Amino acid sequence: MSLLYGLQSTRINRFLSGVNNLANRRQWTPPASCPLAPKLRAVNAYWGLNTVSHCHSVTLLPRNFLFCRTLNHKKSRCLSSAQSKELGVLTYRCTVRGDSVLRQGARKVAGVPALAASCSPSCPAVIEARSFRTSARVQAAPVPLLLLILKPVQKLLAIIVGRGIRKWWQALPPNKKELFKDSVRKNKWRLLLGLSAFGLLFVVFYFTHLEVSPVTGRSKLLLVGKEHFRLLSDLEYEVWMEEFKNDLLPERDPRYLTVKEMVYHLTQCNRDVPGISETNWVVHVVDSPAVNAFVLPNGQVFIFTGLLNSVTDVHQLSFLLGHEIAHAVLGHAAEKASLVHLLDFLGMIFLTMIWAICPRDSLAVLGQWIQSKLQEYMFDRPYSRTLEAEADKVGLQLAAKACADVRASSVFWQQMEFSESLHGYPKLPEWLSTHPSHGNRAEYLDRLIPQALKLREVCNCPPLSGPDPRLLFRLTVKRFLEDSEKEDLNITVKKQKTDALPMQKQEQIPLTYVLEKRTAG
């Protein structure tokens, strides 16, 4: 892979344009008789394009998405629970959608068609993959304000108590230390009983606060009430709106309309999923080069234009939106906050013990640092990666029920991984990150895609046409590497030819020879 690190930006752009051509091979140009054709021509005129395929950033779903299913008067048949159990996917039914429901969503954007091309001709071609994170940790898991304020106070209190115990013990005379040890030995069973009772209460508290997710059937810890957490989400929403108030795209912008219709279609196709129909989903598109997206627990969807410029087609964007919606539906924010509170409580106990046992403050500070890093890398980050993998699985199923090409989901992460290699970013171990690595996410989705394809069939989605985008991506990468090797070989050959040019050799004439000639003359 050392070849990749020396690539010039022009060659990187050429590869990325080749990746974007994958979308062109699967794009659909509607015939003149299609009712969608005038709307598409209006969008192309808005962007100064002649055909749909000129915009490489976001493309149309060929005969599989919202409008074609509406115009063809197709309905999805129901998925029985028995069929769902055989597939091993979501155990609810495919939603029966009438044309009137979809047309109502289409009427809201009569000025500009919903599935519009969402990038301008000036969209940057290079993907800055390293900064991409779906549902950043701070954005996806708001922590209750009271605990945010009390968290440093709790740590300070634990340090003061532990250090006070140590100073008290060091100040005791030797005879009193022996008396205290004898008292502990005499009452060891009472102390053991007290610790056992505390442990039993902790276990009872833990299991009484477990809830089963209605979507996945997985048990999860919830210490924060849903209503309380929704209130905190509203407060966080106000903070984000204040921050992005000058960067939000207007509602008539084609990129905003595209995302809005995709979110509407995803939620309508999955409104039988617990938590989707009860939530009011509101879209906000932030004009920022950051490659990011997140959904608050109260249904506020934030997506950045940098992400719109990074996806190859609408299929990839549909999966990413499904991933973020899955975070909100599964209650990952409340679950992560609950785990943080539990670990903070246990951490206070260990922190008090560290400051009480360590003989010096410097050793206590070192022990506190080790304890925080162990908590972070053994509990926090692995749990975050688990939640991300679960959101990938459920998001893929949501996209499958919306009749997107689920095969494009793994292609997106392959693109991100290859883009990082092209830019020369170091590959960090996965255990250092809150998210799975791009390569592992692509492999995980590849294992889930067969089930998602079966779910598409059960939901009566149109069959997928054209070659597999994963195969096209691999061929594009292979061709790009071959071209790069040829270019490097040509540069090497030219350099060798230049070095092999005959040079006039200047011979040094000895000084004695010159003197002899002059003497003889």
Curated annotation (Swiss-Prot):
EC number: 3.4.24.-
Sequence ranges on the Mitochondrial matrix membrane side: 140-191
Enzyme class of the recorded protein, top EC level: hydrolase
Note accompanying the cofactor annotation: Binds 1 zinc ion per subunit.
Keyword presence, Magnesium: no
Domain of life: Eukaryota
Entry's localization field: Mitochondrion inner membrane
Keywords, alphabetical: Autocatalytic cleavage, Disulfide bond, Hydrolase, Lipid-binding, Membrane, Metal-binding, Metalloprotease, Mitochondrion, Mitochondrion inner membrane, Protease, Transit peptide, Transmembrane, Transmembrane helix, Zinc, Zymogen
Protein name: Metalloendopeptidase OMA1, mitochondrial
Organism whose genome encodes this protein: Mus musculus (Mouse)
